[in-house]
Amino acid sequence: MSRHYEVVFLVHPDQSEQVPAMIERYKSLIEGGNGTIHRLEDWGRRQLAYPIQNLVKAHYVLLNIEVDQAVLSELVESFRFNDAVLRHLVVKRDGADTEQSLIMKSKDEKGDKPERSERRRRDDEEGEAPAANDNDGDNAEAA
């Protein structure tokens, strides 16, 4: 019987270039066992909440999958025997999560913002024009 799971695993930052190959290996393992991948997100290198093996950053990958217990056991076993995987977490879910995670949504929003130097230049240009009206008392954003 297939169930839905959310899987997050952390990869050693020195092994970040190996992550696409690892993802392909895990995808083939899941799909080879008649499983389904509903969502796959590569979050990239992120700050850890606490040091793991004297590391402060790790490469995060999120999977939402639908597999049976045998395939899940094989996947977890492959995490355990891969030295590059620092941590892994498997959580049983009620259904398939297919929409983008909050982390990826916030990453996309940050990606839409202009570069810092471009923002500063634009802010400087905007700051020169209304300089005469700075102290009129109507500007609540200045507080």
From Swiss-Prot:
Protein source organism: Xanthomonas euvesicatoria pv. vesicatoria (strain 85-10)
Keyword Amino-acid biosynthesis: no
Function: Binds together with bS18 to 16S ribosomal RNA.
InterPro entries per record: Ribosomal_bS6, Ribosomal_bS6_sf, Ribosomal_S6_plastid/chlpt, Transl_elong_EF1B/ribsomal_bS6
Gene this protein is translated from: rpsF
UniProt-recorded name of the protein: Small ribosomal subunit protein bS6
GO biological process: translation
GO molecular function (one): structural constituent of ribosome
Assigned protein family: Belongs to the bacterial ribosomal protein bS6 family.
Alphabetic keyword roster: Ribonucleoprotein, Ribosomal protein, RNA-binding, rRNA-binding
UniProt keyword annotation of rRNA-binding present: yes
